[in-house]
Amino acid sequence: MKLPWLAADTPFPPVEQALRDPDGLLAAGADLSPERLAQAYAHGIFPWYAEGEPILWWSPDPRMVLACADFAPSHSLRKRLRALARTEHDPAARLQVRVDTAFARVLHECAAPRHGQPGTWISPAVQQAYHSWHAAGFVHSIETWIDGELAGGLYGVSLGRMFYGESMFARATDASKIALAHLVAFLRRHQVAWIDCQQQTGHLARLGARPVPRARFIEHIAHAVAQPRLPWRSGRLDSAGMLHPLPPANGVMM
């Protein structure tokens, strides 16, 4: 089967036409404009390609999904989260989880080369595209700060009542998992059932993610993305999933 090439005004083909090998490859071409990305994610499609390649669009079957109700932190992480919850409202707390206070830095850290990987798909062009989408209010960072330093976090796409996880990083033990746990609490508070994890990995499976048939995934997001947007704003995120303004900086609440 010949891979469809998308011009600027070409719609995506049906996801059922995606290749089986490589699994989920649907089309190539087009661009990473906010409008094109919104169209893609709303239909269960995402871009993934190496720098120097044309843009490749994917919709694998099955799809890796973390149901928020099935999030399964390890015993040691649960213990650490309980300890954090006891001190999180203390202004002097060493560890704090925030939303959208350092999006560009999170994106940059997620794009850094990983051990055992030859490169990264989060190229400068991808970073620019998602930064533009963040400015439009559809991409968000969840950040773990320790002693005033960014220690880990993740970013993802939010459409309606659906969240699409993109990438995460950690510079300290459990830092990205702590951010994920707080994100799950926020999403559950706002009746978001699933986080799209895109592809199957052992790391995500250990946290409770499971593969679901693509048809079921598409059926779910068709309803979820049509729901009202979540109340995202920059601030501190507590373990119950509530957002709070940051402490005053020069007398101004953030």
Curated annotation (Swiss-Prot):
Its main location: cytoplasm. Its EC number is 2.3.2.6. It holds the Pfam family Leu_Phe_trans. Gene3D superfamilies: Leucyl/phenylalanyl-tRNA-protein transferase, C-terminal domain (3.40.630.70), Leucyl/phenylalanyl-tRNA-protein transferase, N-terminal domain (3.30.70.3550). It is an enzyme of class 2 (transferase). It comes from the Bacteria. It catalyses: N-terminal L-lysyl-[protein] + L-leucyl-tRNA(Leu) = N-terminal L-leucyl-L-lysyl-[protein] + tRNA(Leu) + H(+); N-terminal L-arginyl-[protein] + L-leucyl-tRNA(Leu) = N-terminal L-leucyl-L-arginyl-[protein] + tRNA(Leu) + H(+); L-phenylalanyl-tRNA(Phe) + an N-terminal L-alpha-aminoacyl-[protein] = an N-terminal L-phenylalanyl-L-alpha-aminoacyl-[protein] + tRNA(Phe). Belongs to the L/F-transferase family. This is Leucyl/phenylalanyl-tRNA--protein transferase. The lineage of its organism: Bacteria, Pseudomonadati, Pseudomonadota, Betaproteobacteria, Burkholderiales. The gene is aat.
